[in-house]
């Protein structure tokens, strides 16, 4: 008998221990990771859950461990000791929150039976439940959440505190830890309560209400023991005020400086007037100069825009909605951007055109000798000088770019004839093949008097072997003041055999039958050679030859 009496308490303790283990096992079974209810780590439940109030369904699971607390979010953290045994609380709240409260209702009953048994043996355990003992406080704590819905009280019933008593013995040490997480949780709900636009926070409470209906009966058995923790949440609530992000608007204040766009200063710089178009001298080609200005403006524009761009980054920092108004202020900054373009025509472009003219002068030197030799011929009639044309006008098609007669282009010459034999071709021009008769004409920028011209040198770029007949005739274009232009042939039926390789062909001023005899000062006084005309032979279906340069040999 004595043994039995001594064994009785031991057996009772063993039974209690078995019940607790069974309950824990069941909780673990429900809380298997990847199962219906996941066991969040102790730190995870408080902080992550509140931040994601938007999805109501996820929110309830996180509070599930804290569900022992009456306020759906706040008290939960105190019970977070449950992490070891959060399973019991989690089943009730989560299940009702997502799909249907009905399944959870059966779940609470199952924990209920164990709860009565544990209370009697773990009389020592009550110390942990003792804090929850004051049920009355629990209603007050729900009071703040009341605006969301009376649901908070209902969570208190589901508070399977009955399971919690057994849990406290083992996780008693953790219990202190939960309080620390709890403060974070309340802050999140707290901002909602004060802030009118806290619709998100109400959303989580709304899921909570479903829980109360089913577990309403269980609520009486457990007199809202977790209420004591609830008072703790109120204390954290003060920290909540700091949570309001209004301080973030401070960044916007810097944003106003961004509107300061000093872009207006750029506009003052008046766009420099475009450089006066130089007169069209015989030796200076106009086309090159105009193209140069456009490229120069492009570079200036990129540097200026970067300055306005920095302000735009500032608005991004004030991600909060309040700053959004600030961005409009930066928007005005774009108007200044047009101002930068104005500087673009700054003097910088003007220099750019200057280089383009510089090349033109370089060729001019070649013509410059022209005037000097012209006076010399009289004293030394034997001397022969080669004069190259600076500009050429093709009345048909020049370099394949002309659409109608009269187009102008620069004609390039070489000072040394010997060095050009059978070596690369110069940029030349050729008549359109569709012309009938097909012809091309090069006109010198300045005419030479007939008396000073010994012969004509033409550089031909030979591009095809057939047909044998390349040029039907080569003519000098001669004009006299007050008279119409006339053409005097100086060669006829020029064939490939005469050209040999692309090079220079020189023709004298010997007259041809049917034309004026002799082109000289005695025959045609005051007449000048204006240019050279080449007529393509009738047998050339697709002429591929071109005149690269034409020059006059002075006497």
UniProtKB/Swiss-Prot annotation:
Residues 41-382, 397-439 are annotated as: Disordered. Associates with GP2 and GP3. N-glycosylated and O-glycosylated. The keyword Phosphoprotein does not apply. Residues 41-380 have a biased composition (Pro residues). Keywords: Glycoprotein, Repeat, Signal. Residues 40-339 are annotated as: 49 X 5 AA approximate repeats of P-P-S-P-X. This is Vegetative cell wall protein gp1. Residues 1-29 form the signal peptide. It comes from the Eukaryota. InterPro entries: Keratinocyte_PR, Pistil_extensin. The keyword Phosphoprotein does not apply. It comes from Chlamydomonas reinhardtii. Major component of the outer cell wall W6 (crystalline) layer. Glycans are attached at residues 399, 455, 493.
């Amino acid at each position: 008998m004595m043994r039995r009496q001594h064994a009785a308490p031991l057996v009772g303790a063993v039974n209690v221990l078995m019940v607790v283990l069974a309950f824990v096992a069941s909780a673990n079974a429900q809380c298997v990771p990847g199962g219906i209810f996941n066991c969040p780590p102790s730190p995870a439940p408080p902080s992550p859950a509140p931040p994601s109030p938007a999805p109501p369904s996820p929110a309830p699971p996180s509070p599930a461990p804290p569900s022992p607390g009456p306020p759906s979010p706040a008290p939960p953290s105190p019970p977070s000791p449950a992490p070891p045994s959060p399973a019991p609380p989690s089943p009730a709240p989560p299940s009702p929150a997502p799909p249907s409260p009905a399944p959870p209702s059966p779940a609470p009953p199952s924990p209920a039976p164990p709860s009565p048994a544990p209370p009697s043996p773990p009389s020592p355990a009550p110390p942990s439940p003792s804090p929850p003992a004051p049920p009355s406080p629990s209603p007050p704590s729900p009071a703040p959440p009341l605006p969301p819905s009376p649901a908070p009280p209902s969570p208190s019933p589901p508070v399977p505190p009955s399971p919690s008593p057994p849990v406290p013995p083992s996780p008693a040490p953790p219990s202190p830890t939960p309080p620390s997480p709890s403060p974070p949780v309340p802050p999140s709900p707290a901002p909602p309560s004060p802030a009118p636009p806290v619709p998100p926070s109400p959303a989580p409470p709304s899921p909570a209400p479903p829980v109360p209906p089913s577990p309403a009966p269980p609520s009486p058995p457990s007199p809202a023991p977790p209420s004591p923790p609830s008072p703790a949440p109120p204390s954290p609530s003060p920290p909540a005020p700091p949570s309001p992000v209004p301080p973030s608007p401070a960044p916007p204040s810097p944003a106003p400086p961004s509107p300061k766009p000093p872009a207006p200063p750029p506009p003052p710089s008046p766009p420099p007037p475009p450089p006066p178009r130089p007169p069209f001298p015989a030796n200076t080609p106009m086309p090159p100069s105009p193209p140069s200005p456009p490229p120069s403006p492009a570079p200036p524009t990129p540097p200026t825009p970067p300055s306005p761009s920095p302000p735009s980054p500032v608005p991004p920092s004030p991600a909060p909605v309040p700053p959004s108004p600030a961005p409009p202020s930066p928007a005005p900054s774009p108007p200044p951007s047009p101002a930068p373009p104005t500087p673009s025509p700054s003097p910088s472009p003007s220099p750019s055109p200057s280089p383009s003219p510089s090349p033109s002068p370089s060729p001019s030197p070649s013509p410059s000798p022209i005037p000097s030799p012209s006076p010399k011929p009289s004293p030394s009639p034997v001397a022969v000088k080669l004069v190259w044309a600076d500009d050429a006008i093709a009345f048909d098609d020049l370099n394949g770019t002309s659409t109608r007669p009269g187009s102008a282009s620069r004609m390039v010459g070489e000072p040394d004839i010997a060095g050009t034999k059978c070596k690369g071709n110069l940029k030349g021009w050729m008549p359109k093949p569709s012309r009938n008769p097909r012809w091309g004409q090069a006109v010198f920028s300045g005419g030479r008097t007939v008396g000073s011209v010994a012969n004509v040198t033409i550089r031909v770029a030979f591009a095809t072997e057939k047909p044998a007949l390349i040029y039907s005739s080569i003519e000098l274009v001669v004009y006299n003041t007050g008279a119409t232009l006339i053409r005097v042939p100086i060669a006829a039926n020029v064939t490939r055999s005469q050209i040999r390789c692309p090079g220079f062909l020189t023709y004298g001023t010997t007259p041809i039958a049917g034309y004026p005899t002799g082109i000289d000062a005695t025959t045609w006084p005051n007449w000048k050679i204006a240019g050279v005309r080449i007529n393509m032979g009738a047998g050339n279906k697709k002429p591929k030859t071109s005149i690269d340069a034409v020059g006059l040999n002075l006497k």
